[in-house]
Amino acid sequence: SDDEDSLGEVGKVGVPIDSLEDMETLFADINLGEVSTSMTINAPATTLLALYVATADNQGIPREKLRGTVQNDILKEYIARGLYVYPPKESIRLTTDLFEWCNINTPKWNTISVSGYHIREAGSTAVEEVALTLANGIFYAEEAVKAGLDIDDFAPRMSFFFGCHNDFFEEIAKFRAARELWYELVNERFNPKNPKSSQLRFHTQTAGVTLTAQQPINNAVRVSYQALS
């Protein structure tokens, strides 16, 4: 984070973590066995999770007690956000390796948050948001199975992230359709034994793209209305 290319980012888009010492400073006096930590991190997800687990190890916290989420969704970086580091093949390998490692070592950890929010913010429709997000989720699942994992080893810990826009009934329908489609796709393609493998667990945030700096009061109404759906 002391690179000159980082100067415009430090302190504005998250906490700069360059070392284990930084991670230990961030979580000083916080018992990692008693909290759930969500990290919006993608290309370096394996590195940041390793630092987090090492911090917990140094606190004496059993790894199986750790709870939280890494976003770890590299495909949407190629599609919408642009913050990728490695080529696609190697990036997907890191994603599925994290699935496998967490299944063995940190079974309460959510290993991915497949993100439609960024796709919607980049200009997609509600339909395109769901289509691309579920397509990405299925691709991750297929690659993990190819790597030797069983669908029930990782799918229960997959999570999703959608945006929430102004069209009240469309957004309600979108969330319901996404749940139903994921259930059908996972059951048809992977035949899981654990019912949690086909349950779409998701987080949503109101849409930044619908807001304007010039209308702060309107923004409050917009996000309140969006949250209702």
Per-segment meaning from a language model:
Residues 1, 218-229:
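Non-catalytic terminal/interface segments that mediate subunit docking, oligomerization
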Residues 1-171, 189-192, 196-205:
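Catalytic alpha/beta active-site cores
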Residues 47, 177, 219-222:
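Charged, alpha-helix-enriched surfaces in structured cytosolic catalytic cores
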Residues 140-141, 181, 185:
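Short, well-ordered amphipathic alpha-helical segments that serve as non-catalytic structural scaffolds
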Residues 171-179:
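Extended amphipathic alpha-helical segments enriched in small hydrophobics
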Residues 183, 207-222:
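Flexible, glycine/threonine-enriched loop-and-boundary segments that flank and lead into catalytic domains
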Residues 186-190, 228:
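Alpha-helix capping/termination and helix-coil
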